[in-house]
C-alpha cells in the first residue's frame, strides 16, 4: 500500500463512555484508519481494566486498523506515533517509551495504550488501539493519582492538534506494519528506551523481580536479566524505574 492511498478519517465526540468501546461497537460502519477521539470519557479504562481518569483537556482516542489483527502490532504503531507527535509538539519534554504500552517522562507515566482485538466468528478481524495522553493535568491533580504521573505541555497542547499529529505519524507506521511487521518491530525495539534500565517488575500477588531489561522479544515479551545473570521472559507485569536509572539510560542512548 502506498502512503498516499491511505485516507485518514477523524470522528470527534463530545462525550463517550470509552472510545475503545465505541470503536468496537461501531467498527462495521467505520472506515479503516479512523481515529475516534472525545472531549470527555465517562468510563475510560486502561490495561487490566484499570480506570483511566478522563478530564477534559487531555487526549482520549482510539485508532481503528482493519488491516492488522495482532494487538501487539497496534501497540507498536500507536506508541511510535504518539512518541513522534509529542516530540513534534513539545520537543523540550524528554518523553520515552516503556514496555509494554506506556510513554513516560522521567519515572512518571504520561500516556497509556490499550490495544484490543475485534473478534467475529472466533476470528480477529481488526484492532482498536486506545490512547490516553496527559496534556492538561495540574501538578496538584497529578499528586492525587496513586502512581507517579506527568503531564505533557502544561495544557498548551490542544487535543485536536495532537490528534492530527498522531494520525500523521500513525499512517506511516500502519503502512509499515502491513508491509513488514518485522521492520516495525525492529524500529519499535530500537526506540524502546526501557532496554538497558535497572527495574523492578511486579508480577502480582506481592511477587517482584529485579534486574536489567536486556531486550524485548519479537512476540512482545520483556527479557529481564536478574542479578545472577539469568535471562527470563515475561509477558505481563508492572514495571517500576527510578529517576537515576532513567536518566542514565537516556544519556547513554544519546551518546550511542
Give the label of every model feature segment:
Residues 1-91, 109, 118, 254-256:
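N-terminal lobe of the biotin/lipoate ligase/transferase fold
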Residues 5, 69-71, 76-95, 105-256:
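Long, positively charged amphipathic alpha-helical accessory segments at protein N-termini or as interdomain linkers
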Amino acid at each position: 500500500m502506498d502512503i498516499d492511498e491511505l485516507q485518514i478519517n477523524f470522528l470527534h465526540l463530545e462525550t463517550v463512555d470509552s472510545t475503545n468501546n465505541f470503536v468496537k461497537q461501531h467498527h462495521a460502519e467505520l472506515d479503516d484508519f479512523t481515529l475516534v477521539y472525545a472531549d470527555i470519557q465517562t468510563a475510560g479504562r486502561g490495561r487490566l481494566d484499570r480506570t483511566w481518569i478522563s478530564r477534559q483537556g487531555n487526549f482520549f482516542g482510539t485508532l481503528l486498523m482493519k488491516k492488522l489483527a495482532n494487538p501487539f502490532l497496534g501497540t507498536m504503531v500507536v506508541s511510535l506515533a504518539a512518541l513522534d507527535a509529542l516530540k513534534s509538539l513539545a520537543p523540550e519534554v524528554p518523553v520515552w517509551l516503556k514496555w509494554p504500552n506506556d510513554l513516560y517522562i522521567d519515572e512518571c507515566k504520561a500516556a497509556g495504550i490499550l490495544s484490543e482485538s475485534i473478534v467475529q466468528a472466533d476470528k480477529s478481524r481488526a484492532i482498536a488501539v486506545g490512547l490516553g495522553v496527559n496534556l492538561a493535568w495540574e501538578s496538584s491533580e497529578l499528586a492525587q493519582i496513586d502512581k507517579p504521573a506527568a503531564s505533557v505541555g502544561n495544557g498548551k497542547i490542544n487535543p485536536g492538534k495532537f490528534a492530527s499529529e498522531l494520525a500523521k505519524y500513525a499512517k506511516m507506521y500502519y503502512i509499515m506494519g502491513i508491509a513488514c511487521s518485522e521492520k516495525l518491530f525492529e524500529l519499535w525495539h530500537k526506540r524502546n528506551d526501557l532496554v538497558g534500565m535497572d527495574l523492578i517488575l511486579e508480577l502480582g500477588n506481592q511477587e517482584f523481580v529485579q534486574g536489567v531489561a536486556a531486550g524485548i522479544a519479537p512476540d512482545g515479551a520483556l527479557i529481564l536479566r536478574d542479578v545472577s545473570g539469568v535471562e527470563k521472559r515475561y509477558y505481563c507485569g508492572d514495571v517500576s524505574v527510578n529517576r537515576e536509572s532513567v536518566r542514565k539510560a537516556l544519556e547513554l542512548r544519546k551518546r550511542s
